[in-house]
Regions:
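Structured catalytic core of nucleotide-sugar glycosyltransferases
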Residues: 1-132
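Acceptor/aglycone-binding surface of glycosyltransferases and processive sugar-polymer synthases
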Residues: 66-86, 103-185, 201-220
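Conserved S-adenosyl-L-methionine
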Residues: 197
Length: 221
């Protein structure tokens, strides 16, 4: 089976209010980048709202959309891993469901990958709109501490928003770790990895899925 040029993988937890606009914007960005040769993979991570019902409705009207329903809430990193394991694209864009990371940057990220002959283009947050000073300070401190205690340097001010080649994704998927820290694991696999600066938008709807207590638990794992 021929692979699509692009997969867009999006883990979702209680994001029903974002999904229709997310689907429309991601679909438009994908078509602008690769025409009709793409897939969108939504992973419902045990949501308690109407996320799964919305996904099913959207998938019924869009052959490009694959909707995966996990049996319970497994957490963002495992949900994302499930989507990465099932996606088929030659390039894979990872993006969150809250629309803080603009899918419209896809074309420029692909151009960066091509021009710099990179296997990973990771998005670096230049500005973070709509976040409290406390959130910005705790996030900055958390990732700087995490960077100091890990063996592999992890780019600062990044999330999981990134574009990966198929060979980089296959290398990531070969790693056996059960406790998944995806941005750290991607940094570890090697290949040429380059930054892409962007301004992070406000969340479209809902609340953050990474409050301080979850960040602490994440670090302890």
């Amino acid at each position: 089976m021929q692979r699509p040029q692009l997969s867009v993988v999006i883990p979702c937890y209680n994001e029903a209010a974002c999904l229709e606009l997310l689907h429309a914007r991601v679909g438009a960005a994908a078509r602008g980048a690769v025409g009709d040769d793409y897939e969108i993979v939504f992973i419902n991570d045990g949501s308690r709202d109407d996320s799964w019902a919305v996904m099913q409705r959207l998938a019924a009207g869009d052959p490009h959309l694959v909707a995966i329903n996990l049996s319970r809430n497994h957490g963002h990193q495992l949900a994302l891993t499930a989507g990465l394991d099932l996606c088929a694209g030659e390039q894979v864009l990872i993006i969150d469901a809250d629309l803080q990371d603009p899918p419209e940057l896809l074309t420029d990220m692909r151009a960066t990958m091509r021009e710099q002959e990179a296997d990973v283009v990771y998005a670096v947050r230049r500005r973070r709109e709509g976040e409290t000073l406390f959130k910005k300070m705790t996030a900055a401190g958390f990732y700087r501490i995490l960077d100091r205690v890990t063996d592999t340097p992890i780019p600062l001010d990044t999330g999981d928003f990134r574009l990966m080649s198929r060979r980089a994704l296959d290398a990531f998927l070969s790693l056996p770790e059960q406790a998944r820290f995806i941005r750290g694991m991607v940094a570890w696999i090697g290949f040429r990895q380059v930054p892409f600066l962007y301004d992070r938008a406000e969340r479209h709807a809902g609340t953050t899925k990474y409050p301080l207590r979850k960040m602490i638990a994440f670090a302890l794992d």
